Amino acid sequence: MKRQKRDRLDRAFAKGFQAGVGGRSKEMCPYSNLDSRSQWLGGWREGVDGRITGLFTK
């Protein structure tokens, strides 16, 4: 049975979240498409918030 790839926007959010938790700058967003970039930045913000509140460590 084939596994389906996640939706592109979900993947952009997840990558942004990983970047935020990892402490990367939001200027390092790899997306130029507005929708994907917005999702990446949303994930990045949540990742940074989680890192700041102590939910995640590097």
UniProtKB/Swiss-Prot annotation:
Predominant subcellular localization, coarse grouping: cytoplasm
Keyword Cytoplasm attributed: yes
Coiled coil among keywords: no
A GO BP annotation: regulation of translation
Pfam families recorded: RMF
InterPro entries tied to this protein: Ribosome_modulation_factor, RMF_sf
Gene3D superfamilies: ribosome modulation factor like domain (1.10.10.620)
Origin superkingdom: Bacteria
GO cellular component, one term: cytoplasm
Keywords assigned by UniProt, alphabetized: Cytoplasm, Translation regulation
Subcellular location: Cytoplasm
NCBIfam families named in the record: PRK14563.1 (NF011162), Rmf_CrpP_fam (NF041886)
Record function comment: During stationary phase, converts 70S ribosomes to an inactive dimeric form (100S ribosomes).
Family named by the database record: Belongs to the ribosome modulation factor family.
Name of this protein: Ribosome modulation factor
Origin species: Shewanella amazonensis (strain ATCC BAA-1098 / SB2B)
